[in-house]
Amino acid sequence: MDELKKAMKIAFAIKAQNFHWNVEGPLFPQLHMLFATVYEEVYGAIDDFAENIRKLGSYTPASFQRFSMLTQVEDELNMLEDRAMIAELLQDSDKMVKLLKIVFDLSEQAGEHGLSDFIAGRMDAHRKHSWQLRATSKE
């Protein structure tokens, strides 16, 4: 169950929103929109994560302390240059895909096919984020 809770991605969404708010440089318009697309899409799935956790009979994490204990994403306290923001968010998105794959495999083993379907959709969304970030980082 902790793997599913780790996959909720609160910290990832907050980081993408931080980058959306604070990006600067010649790519500002494009990156501002890209980071918004990422954080809005991720935030949009958080309630579904919580409901899937509840369907399995567990309580959802609902405090900053609990989220920080579960996160797989490092907090970014410094203001980064635009290229570093892309690289860091890409690395985190790739981490999320790996974590989601673990959750997918566990849900399949448990016969929780509805959860597997949801997680497969989340993996696809993060692969798309990774692709867009990777393509944006090309010189």
Describe each PLM feature range:
Residues 1-4, 8, 34, 85-88, ...:
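Non-transmembrane, amphipathic alpha-helical segments
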Residues 12-38, 99-114:
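Helix-loop segments that flank and shape redox-cofactor active sites
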Residues 22, 59-81:
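Short, helix-capping/interhelical loops that line the mouth of catalytic, cofactor-
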Residues 34, 74, 128-129:
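Alpha-helix boundary/interfacial micro-motifs
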Residues 47, 51, 71-121:
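Acidic/histidine-rich alpha-helical segments that form the ligand environment
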